[in-house]
Amino acid sequence: MTSTVPFVSNGVANGNGNGSLNPQISARIRERLREAGASFLANDNIADHLQPGELDQLQVEVADKVRDLLRSLVIDIDNDHNTHETAERVAKMYLQEVFKGRYHQQPKVASFPNVKQLDEIYTVGPITVRSACSHHLVPIMGNCWIGIKPGARVIGLSKFTRVADWVFSRPHIQEEAVMILADEIEKLCEPQGLGIIIKAQHYCMKWRG
């Protein structure tokens, strides 16, 4: 027997009477990225390709998927008060907090002419950085030190912290995170010299044993 009632799971019925579904918001975003030839690897920022309201829709979809994951882990989320709202919490955590560097624009950073013609090396740090291993999605926690030999332009010291937080708030391996952070700093202030040191604990090693 063929059902005439559209089945909706994470999709939205389009209301045209034929029971077909609109594609999930993640599928629409992926299609847009592919059409633009844009990379969407784990540590890429895709904010330029998100339309207004889509991040909220994506958060709802992610919560649905996390709910499915918990059920597949045989966790009774309907009767366990500790996990009843876990899916919503995890979705918000990923999109708005720990992976915000993928979905949100870079913090605004103003640069200024180096009118004093400073050319001495200075350092900023330790800066607390938090990320996640892109292999297992478990935390990477540590500190970052940035050494700069100024060029024609300079930025405020607090801006290094904001940019580092934005870059590290994505799934990463540490080596790539350092390269991305260096590229962003070079674009912002074009230093004569730049050095970055990261000292971090990787919980894919500590937690998993």
What are these regions (language model features)?
Residues 2-209:
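A domain-level signal for the structural core that forms small-molecule/cofactor-binding pockets
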